[in-house]
Amino acid sequence: MSDIRHSLLRRDALSAAKEVLYHLDIYFSSQLQSAPLPIVDKGPVELLEEFVFQVPKERSAQPKRLNSLQELQLLEIMCNYFQEQTKDSVRQIIFSSLFSPQGNKADDSRMSLLGKLVSMAVAVCRIPVLECAASWLQRTPVVYCVRLAKALVDDYCCLVPGSIQTLKQIFSASPRFCCQFITSVTALYDLSSDDLIPPMDLLEMIVTWIFEDPRLILITFLNTPIAANLPIGFLELTPLVGLIRWCVKAPLAYKRKKKPPLSNGHVSNKVTKDPGVGMDRDSHLLYSKLHLSVLQVLMTLQLHLTEKNLYGRLGLILFDHMVPLVEEINRLADELNPLNASQEIELSLDRLAQALQVAMASGALLCTRDDLRTLCSRLPHNNLLQLVISGPVQQSPHAALPPGFYPHIHTPPLGYGAVPAHPAAHPALPTHPGHTFISGVTFPFRPIR
């Protein structure tokens, strides 16, 4: 690597960046022939940091900076490299060497360039780059994933009006990237404050994607070898938890956003012109469609978990993630109570109850009814939620039924002793003489009044 470095020092920034990609392509291609998963050591990473991210090796040296035109040319070089490299394994390891966080001063430059590269790949539809980015999102800590998601949202939802259509078109080009992008976005926008409510254009795009094909949010789960214990601090296998959070919290979060300002401790009588208020009906319909799609996906999970031999072993919706959600709902309900938000609270709790019931029935949420009772005990009363946390109703033994009979529906029968289901046959009753049929006898008919 030292010989390569000395040759690169004599080149200008752009040709050095192109040359280092060429050398590392040869290096990792040879490594992959001897080992299916070669270890990326320190040498290649340092070369990339010095000649791609312009971070000098010597601490005393001043970092170089590319101007805007040079940076655009560098992005084009990288886009073309990943497009022209036909071996996915080589692409993936080069992408990982470039953009895996190292915990050093180069990480800011690394993340900035990654956001611009993926944004360019979306604009010019470079599928290999999007596929590499999907893998990167899957194996990178969530704190970096939300930074990439934020960069894309800024570029396509905030910077240029109408550019969301460009982002929307990658649905058919790279569904795997779309799935990971949705997971990142739901981690970024958790509705904990007005600033963290997803932009309307972004919400509409995601709902359109999922409503068109609900299986989109299961792509990563269905195409990834999965262990029963998932690593902590990374993105979830599916965006289900984040989407449930959106659907459940949305009625309360949007009501909080419309909260009138206080004047000397009293609610102002003036009508405030909030740009979000006019979109309430549209957002309500979008969240309703999203909630329906999420329930449809949850209903299919039992089959998929069984096929992967993970039914009862892997909870795609962790109970630990439901705890903060319920606490947030309770806090919002208390906060909005003076504003007569009874309809919004009812809708929020209805959606929570439906999601919990379907998730438990499909095996996506592994917990007991007692866990749910404890969790939801402080929430406002809701009829549907009470039915869910109570579970199937067990009928009390009836005097007319034999002791061995129990009409169970969803719960197993109680463990009674070995009692025969029916008593012994009683002696035959005396027979009565048959009645002679007399033809021609009419019976009076009187209608019931």
Curated annotation (Swiss-Prot):
Q: Where is it chiefly localized?
A: nucleus
- Report the record's Gene Ontology biological process terms: brain development; eye development; mRNA splicing, via spliceosome; RNA polymerase II transcription initiation surveillance
Entry keyword set: Chromosome, Nucleus
Which parts of the chain span the membrane according to its record? none
Q: Name its cellular compartments.
A: Nucleus; Chromosome
Q: Which InterPro entries does the record associate with it?
A: INTS15
Superkingdom of origin: Eukaryota
Which cysteines are disulphide-bonded?
A: none
Sorted alphabetically, the Gene Ontology cellular component annotations on this record are: chromosome; INTAC complex; integrator complex; nucleus
Write down the Pfam families for this protein, in alphabetical order.
INTS15
PANTHER family linked:
INTEGRATOR COMPLEX SUBUNIT 15
Outline the subunit composition: Component of the Integrator complex, composed of core subunits INTS1, INTS2, INTS3, INTS4, INTS5, INTS6, INTS7, INTS8, INTS9/RC74, INTS10, INTS11/CPSF3L, INTS12, INTS13, INTS14 and INTS15. The core complex associates with protein phosphatase 2A subunits PPP2CA and PPP2R1A, to form the Integrator-PP2A (INTAC) complex. INTS15 is part of the tail subcomplex, composed of INTS10, INTS13, INTS14 and INTS15.
**According to its UniProt record, which protein family does this protein belong to?**
Belongs to the Integrator subunit 15 family.
User: What functional role does this protein have?
Assistant: Component of the integrator complex, a multiprotein complex that terminates RNA polymerase II (Pol II) transcription in the promoter-proximal region of genes.
Q: What is this protein called?
A: Integrator complex subunit 15
